Regions:
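Cytosolic/stromal cytosol-facing helical appendages immediately following the last transmembrane segment
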Residues: 1-26, 30, 39-64, 68, ...
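Hydrophobic alpha-helical membrane-embedded segments
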Residues: 31-48, 82-87, 120-131, 199
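Juxtamembrane helix-loop-helix connectors linking adjacent transmembrane helices
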Residues: 57, 84-124
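Interfacial transmembrane-helix boundary/kink motif in multi-pass membrane proteins
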Residues: 58-79, 104-116
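Select subsegments of transmembrane alpha-helices in polytopic membrane proteins
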Residues: 70-86, 159-167
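Alpha-helical transmembrane segments and their membrane-interface junctions
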Residues: 79-98, 170-181
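Membrane-interface loops
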Residues: 100-107, 123-153
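Membrane-embedded alpha-helical segments that form the functional core of polytopic membrane enzymes
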Residues: 109-129, 133, 189-202
């Protein structure tokens, strides 16, 4: 009992001795990990115990236990170890940009934080879209991005199955830059990280109900649907329906879905 109390007290002392910048960024790290592992393990449990549920690319997107363990190990290396290594850098960037950070003790103003969220959405849409497209360039793809495309029909844990460079530049950069640039209140930053991690797990889950359709088509067709936001793919004409060779390409599950007349396609 004494040792447990001492450990808890030490943890509180460490947190109390951090400045606001470090508290905010480490909070983002903890929230991101909690949401990622919750979503990944939950989706894997559904895959394992409810294998008959329809997936966007059919049942081939179910991982074996061995493949899941491998993907989870890579995810652990990225989101636990690599992400922790860059937390000080995130805090330092926040420190360099804003002399007066907002902490948990500061008042939360919803109108301001709504603008912060809007700004963060614009940042991640632009940042992820262009870093992702760059990763598809022939000079970079084989060395870095090909690893993420190992799974043409991914599941949630594959959301951060990536080369560390891609993970840190594209994934972490895209999610973290918005709250840092906009000097988000920590509650906003933590909520943004939670939504971002749950969203990326959903988009890799293979379940249409979790938002997998758009990004799953990217993994299947490769040269479309690069973005995660609502703007860049539309603006730069890289949606599946904007590209002639893909526009009328049937979805692999179409034969199991109702057609326009309500009958099976």
């Amino acid at each position: 009992m004494f040792q447990e109390g001492a450990a808890f007290g030490t943890s509180m002392d460490i947190l109390a001795n951090m400045d606001t910048y470090d508290q905010n960024v480490w909070g983002c790290y903890v929230v991101a990990n909690a949401c990622f592992w919750f979503a990944s393990l939950s989706c894997h449990a559904v895959d394992t115990f409810c294998p008959g549920l329809e997936k966007t690319q059919g049942q081939k997107s179910h991982m074996t236990q061995r493949t899941f363990a491998h993907a989870a190990a890579v995810a652990f290396a990225n989101i636990v170890i690599c992400a922790a290594a860059v937390v000080p850098g995130g805090a330092n960037l926040w420190r360099a940009l804003h002399a007066a950070p907002l902490g948990v003790g500061n008042a939360f103003h919803p109108p301001r934080e709504a603008l912060v969220l809007a700004g963060s959405l614009l940042v991640i849409d632009f940042w992820f879209y262009w870093t992702h497209r760059a990763m598809h360039h022939s000079s970079i793809y084989r060395a870095i991005h090909k690893m993420h495309h190992r799974f043409t029909a991914p599941t949630a844990v594959a959301a951060v199955y990536a080369h560390p460079v891609e993970f840190l530049v594209g994934n972490v950069g895209g999610v973290a830059l918005g709250p840092i640039l906009c000097n988000a209140h920590p509650y906003t930053a933590w909520a943004w990280f939670a939504v971002s991690l749950l969203s990326t797990c959903g988009s890799h889950s293979g379940y249409a109900a979790l938002g997998a359709d758009k990004h799953d088509e990217h993994h299947r067709l490769f040269d479309c649907n690069f973005g995660v936001g609502p703007f860049c793919d539309s603006l730069f004409k890289t949606r599946k329906e904007d590209i002639p060779k893909f526009a009328n390409k049937p979805h692999p599950m179409d034969r199991f879905r109702p057609g326009k007349d309500g009958k099976r396609a």
